[in-house]
């Protein structure tokens, strides 16, 4: 759980208080989920953002998948905020910098209208060298988001549908961490409101490029056997 300073969004507002694990309708077995809440009263001091990720940066090739509930409306308060609901990987620095993003913005941001999902492969964040594809539609509800990395080709999929691919210099050059965060691009008005982003499960396979059907089957098999968390990444390399 991130509590460190810095961005993105409203800097120095990352809070462990906004990370929780409630049960949720529509989750696998209607069980507990990760809930990341972005809340504000419209001021910097009254803002809390939420982020959770892996401590290690050992992820590179393979299949990344997460079942995520994106929200077009706040859980409480007035709507219209430029919130960013993100599933991403990041690692390395300098010539090894690597970042792969799924960024959902129900109300847009940075002057671009929403709802929209940006799938982004980075080469260099300092020079803003990246390639991306925008999917301009509402994603309110549950979706299985996937990123596969194989032979220096990155492919983004949603619910099994291919959204975007990148290759060459826009493929990862180092190990990365896997993260989820929920943050405000800006604070356009005053008043209390809170937005929720939910994550049902995260699955990673370092050795294979899998289909959404194969991922869902694996997750259901593991859950059915009572395995709610395990890490074999180090053993698979």
Please place each PLM-identified region on the residue numbering:
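Low-complexity, Ser/Thr/Pro/Gly-rich disordered linker/stalk regions
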Residues: 1-79, 85, 91, 204-237
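Structural recognition of the beta-strand scaffold that forms the well-ordered cores
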Residues: 35-37, 65-66, 86-88, 99-103, ...
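Glycan-recognition/cleft segments
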Residues: 85-121
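Short, aromatic/His-centered strand-loop micro-motif at the edge of beta-sheets
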Residues: 119-142
């Amino acid at each position: 759980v991130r509590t460190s300073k810095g961005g993105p969004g409203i800097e120095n507002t990352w809070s462990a208080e906004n990370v929780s694990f409630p049960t949720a309708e529509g989750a696998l077995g209607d069980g507990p989920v990760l809930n990341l809440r972005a809340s504000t009263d419209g001021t910097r001091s009254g803002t809390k953002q939420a982020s959770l990720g892996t401590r290690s940066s050992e992820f590179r090739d393979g299949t990344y998948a997460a079942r995520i509930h994106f929200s077009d409306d706040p859980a409480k308060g007035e709507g219209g905020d430029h919130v960013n609901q993100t599933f991403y990987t990041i690692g390395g620095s300098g010539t090894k910098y690597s970042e792969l993003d799924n960024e959902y913005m129900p109300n847009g941001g940075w002057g671009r209208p929403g709802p929209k999902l940006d799938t982004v492969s980075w080469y260099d964040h300092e020079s803003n060298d990246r390639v991306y594809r925008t999917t301009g539609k509402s994603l309110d509800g549950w979706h299985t988001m996937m990123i596969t990395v194989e032979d220096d080709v990155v492919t983004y999929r949603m619910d099994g549908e291919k959204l975007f691919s990148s290759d060459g210099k826009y493929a990862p050059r180092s190990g990365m961490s896997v993260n989820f965060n929920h943050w405000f691009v800006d604070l356009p008005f005053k008043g209390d409101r809170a937005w929720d982003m939910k994550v049902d499960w995260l699955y990673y396979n370092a050795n294979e490029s899998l289909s959404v059907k194969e991922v869902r089957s694996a997750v259901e098999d593991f859950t059915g056997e009572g395995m709610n968390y395990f890490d074999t990444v180090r053993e698979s390399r």
